[in-house]
From Swiss-Prot:
Pfam families cross-referenced by the UniProt entry: COQ7
Lineage start: Bacteria, Pseudomonadati, Pseudomonadota, Betaproteobacteria, Burkholderiales
Gene encoding the protein: coq7
Family from the record: Belongs to the COQ7 family.
Assigned keywords, A-Z: Cell membrane, Iron, Membrane, Metal-binding, Monooxygenase, Oxidoreductase, Ubiquinone biosynthesis
Protein name: 3-demethoxyubiquinol 3-hydroxylase
Metabolic or biological pathway, per its Swiss-Prot or TrEMBL entry: Cofactor biosynthesis; ubiquinone biosynthesis
Source organism: Cupriavidus metallidurans (strain ATCC 43123 / DSM 2839 / NBRC 102507 / CH34) (Ralstonia metallidurans)
EC number: 1.14.99.60
Length: 207
């Protein structure tokens, strides 16, 4: 029962944007630069950071579901450790959205519920499949973050610092999942994940 209460609290905080980072925000070492962006650039960066915030909401749901369905304590511990770092990402993205005078996606409860359901399916397929799903998810997120870094205004070093640290963490999470025994996912599954990602990114940019 205590575990369920704790996990429910994690879900509520992720959806409500009430998470707190354990690590320092990478942007804290930089001076505020938002005022150097024109209104169009600020709207664009807000859209990108909203997408990244949604991605971290989904990451919390995925890791939570896969942790609850893991077959072994080792995999459960690995999912828990990664989820804590992803919680840092969630808090950093929320901080940046506030700095930009923007907001998270209004559809966060929907994104969370959908990602949790997918995580349960991956977890029930077994630890090797679940770890493979983590590895593929992190690979796609790495590419997505690289794309966002390319699309940031040159003056926005604060968002850049956050996304670069997030990308480094995602690469490490993916490598850890593969090294722990994650197996490659079938091509159709990878393609379906990419389609779902495009739907999320297109919608979250605006809503």
């Amino acid at each position: 029962m205590d575990t369920l209460i704790r996990e429910f609290d994690v879900a509520l905080r992720a959806i409500a944007g009430a998470t707190r980072a354990e690590r320092a925000n990478p942007a804290d070492r930089l001076a505020p630069e938002t005022e150097q962006m024109n209104p169009e650039e600020r709207r664009h960066v807000s859209g990108l950071m909203r997408i990244n915030h949604v991605g971290e909401v989904c990451a919390q749901a995925l890791y939570q579901a896969q942790k609850l369905t893991a077959r072994t304590p080792a995999v459960r511990a690995q999912m828990d450790a990664a989820a804590k770092e992803e919680e840092d990402h969630l808090a950093w993205c929320a901080d940046r959205l506030r700095e930009l005078g923007s907001r998270p996606s209004l559809l966060n409860p929907v994104w969370y519920a959908g990602a949790f359901a997918i995580g349960v399916l991956a977890g029930r397929a077994g630890d090797k499949v679940s770890l493979g799903f983590v590895a593929e998810t992190e690979r796609q997120v790495e590419h997505h973050l690289t794309s966002h870094l390319d699309r940031l205004p040159t003056t926005d070093s604060r968002s850049r610092a956050i996304l670069e640290q997030m990308r480094d963490d995602e690469v490490r999470h993916g490598d850890a999942a593969r090294n722990a025994g994650g197996i490659p996912l079938p091509g159709p599954v990878r393609a379906l994940m990419q389609v779902a990602s495009r739907v999320m990114t297109t919608t979250a940019y605006r809503i």
